[in-house]
């Protein structure tokens, strides 16, 4: 496996809203950076994975229709989406994953988010399953204090589930253990 953390978005849909694609996370400048974390099952990607691993591709595909014409007037915000501002937006592609290497996938995801943050860009994560916030939360350790608002049907407070402590059932529990989270609602 190479040292690259990300791969370009699938050619079929290209980048989010055709924003420039960034392949070198160590050398880019942007205000906003889209990053796909396409993992579909935090317990065993090969055994019972689901379609959540395709979410970044589908988000890019279906948002294209909604985002046509960034210069169009939006009544909700009282102007155009970027409002004539010189905002540089890029798409960093998807974090490269390996089936059966959940811990490695989380490590690569955390490293990729850290690199986006180090560039000065605000990361917008296109995910995958409910476990992907954990590496994103870890990457935010120098950006606190953070107030987290969880909107979900269940609390995601398990310590360990199926032998995994960094899965989709443990997201809020893991956040509560991180010093940079001030409050969780």
Give the predicted meaning of each segment:
Residues 2-185:
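Conserved alpha-helical scaffold segments that buttress catalytic/binding sites
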């Amino acid at each position: 496996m190479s040292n690259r953390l990300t791969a370009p978005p699938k050619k079929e849909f290209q980048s989010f809203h055709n924003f420039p694609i960034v392949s070198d996370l160590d050398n880019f400048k942007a205000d906003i950076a889209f990053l796909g974390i396409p993992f579909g099952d935090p317990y065993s990607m090969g055994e019972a994975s689901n379609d959540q691993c395709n979410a970044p591709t589908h988000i890019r595909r279906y948002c294209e229709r909604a985002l046509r014409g960034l210069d169009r007037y939006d009544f909700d915000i009282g102007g155009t989406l970027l409002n004539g501002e010189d905002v540089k937006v890029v798409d960093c592609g998807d974090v490269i994953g390996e089936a059966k290497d959940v811990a490695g996938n989380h490590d690569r995801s955390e490293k990729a988010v850290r690199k986006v943050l180090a560039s000065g860009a605000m990361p917008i994560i296109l995910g995958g399953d409910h476990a992907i916030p954990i590496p994103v939360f870890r990457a935010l350790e120098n950006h606190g204090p953070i107030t987290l608002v969880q909107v979900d049907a269940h609390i995601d407070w398990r310590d360990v589930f199926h032998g995994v402590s960094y899965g989709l059932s443990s997201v809020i529990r893991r956040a509560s253990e991180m010093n940079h989270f001030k409050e969780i609602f």
